[in-house]
Amino acid sequence: MRVVILGSGVVGVASAYYLARAGHEVTVIDREAGPALETSFANAGQISPGYAAPWAAPGVPLKAVKWMFEKHAPLAIRLDGTRFQLQWMYQMLRNCTAERYAVNKGRMVRLAEYSRDCLQALRADTGIQYEGRTGGTLQLFRTQQQLDGAAKDIAVLQEANVPFELLSPADLKKAEPALAAVSHKLTGGLRLPGDETGDCQLFTTRLAALAESLGVKFRYNTPIDALAIAGGKIAGVQCGSETVRADAYVVALGSYSTSFISNLMKIPVYPLKGYSITAPIVNEAAAPVSTVLDETYKIAITRFDQRIRVGGMAEIVGFDKKLRAARRETLEMCVNDLFPGGGDTSKATFWTGLRPMTPDGTPIVGRTPVSNLFLNTGHGTLGWTMSCGSGQLLADLISGKMPAIQADDLSVHRYLKDVAGQTRPAYA
């Protein structure tokens, strides 16, 4: 089957690789000059299935009000003048109940765990290198309230059989030796030994090369203008004056997926702006060995070979790509507070990206009401974590195979409404 994939971020490239491995003739189209040059370029570098959780959580609405008055707040909201933003935030608020949080987190952990398994199999098969580490993830708590609040996440981890360790301040140095110097600032930590890290942009670039060796064609610097429709199906992709035709089409355009298919269906994928800095390591003993999550500031600090990546925060501000100095100050403050002297933040590069987020946190992967149109978008802050599993799942669906995990509640159908305004039963 001929398949066209729109988008060459980590999700689009992973989709291309698994489809090519399944025997399909694949073409990837992107407006950029190469793979992973937008949202996948400088993310936090974590592959953290156990920490796959929606931003829509109990207590977040009240926290959001408090964060409005804090300098280093992890969440910021500025109205972008669109009705869509207001609708999206309303849907997100509706998902901030304990019941919906548990359902949404369960879906996310299921896909993320499967995705890590797919990544490990890919690594074993190909030997792909991307400055990866398998040292686990450590969530750090600065208050007793945060430590007590971890109970709901631990319950989900136990239900999903995800290994974890609850650490006292004195035990944190066993996972991250450099934290010994700042353990007095912390009340404990939750460690997931099965989590991994790696440079997402490097991984995507090398996976694209592997995909090319399987026959995938990459068309960069190519405008993606519109989908041509005929007879209720997609008849091609309009790229400037050219129409590219295939048997099946995959939209993996991140935050831009919403507007691109708006004439066909409405999907609630909104850009959630995040930031990162990448600093050179100057003192190995003071640097992290894997990755930590600062629960207070919602910031991840990740070790690459000779660099530290510090990323996080969320701004609901539309398609604004402005680099804000105050956000850099927060990232530098966090890493220098936990790992003083480990990296030289004065020489750090500063980046921002738009994560494609759904109100419930779960991505949209699978079939659509248009028979030859498939979606792979809405992964939010977890595109790197979920990329391989999403690509394999999509390849199975397009190939007519039964996916290895439950996929019916991951598709767009959970958001589509029937004439009575009720959500239709979800199916893949």
Swiss-Prot record:
Its EC number is 1.4.99.-. GO terms for molecular function: D-amino-acid dehydrogenase activity. Pathway: Amino-acid degradation; D-alanine degradation; NH(3) and pyruvate from D-alanine: step 1/1. One of its GO terms (biological process) is D-alanine catabolic process. The keyword rRNA-binding does not apply. It holds the Pfam family DAO. InterPro entries: DadA, FAD-dep_OxRdtase, FAD/NAD-bd_sf. FAD binds at residues 3-17. It catalyses: a D-alpha-amino acid + A + H2O = a 2-oxocarboxylate + AH2 + NH4(+). Oxidative deamination of D-amino acids. This is D-amino acid dehydrogenase. It comes from Burkholderia lata (strain ATCC 17760 / DSM 23089 / LMG 22485 / NCIMB 9086 / R18194 / 383).
